[in-house]
Amino acid sequence: MRTQWDIVIIGAGPAGMSAALQATRHGLSVLVLDRQAEPGGQIFRSAGSASADKRKQIGADYARGEALVREFRQSPATFLGGANVWHLAPGRAYVSHQGTSHVMQARQILIATGAMERPVPLPGWT
């Protein structure tokens, strides 16, 4: 597995994918890490494999997410899904992937971890 990159991006949601696309357009080597198996983040989760019914139900914004995921997948950026970043140091990201630890070296590290769903317990919410 390659371990030296110009940029390591943590998070494959809309911000992480967009940053990766911009960086690759400038000829930089890019590794995008995400704990989920597929890119898209919380908002475009499973955008690349959504059924026609789901796309119709969710609407036009989801279609834009599908286009972003498709462009990201076709880019020269490397995506490593199922990766857990457990430590950061200047120029280094310590990552566990499929039971093995790796040290990814980068000139820059971008943290784009995005949003997380969180239920807000209100009286009668269940």
PLM-predicted stretches and their roles:
Residues 7, 28-30, 109:
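Hydrophobic anchor at the start of a short beta-strand
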Residues 25-43:
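Glycine-rich FAD pyrophosphate-binding loop
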Residues 13-15, 38, 115-117:
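Residue-level detector of alpha-helix initiation sites
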Residues 10-11, 33, 111:
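Conserved N-terminal Rossmann-fold NAD(P)-binding element of oxidoreductases
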Residues 20, 24:
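Gly/Ala-rich phosphate-binding loop of Rossmann-like dinucleotide-binding domains
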Residues 1-5, 64-126:
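FAD-binding core/adjacent interface of flavoenzyme oxidoreductases
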Residues 51-70:
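Short beta-strand to alpha-helix junction loop
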Residues 1-15:
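Beta1/beta-strand and adjacent pyrophosphate-binding region of the FAD-binding site
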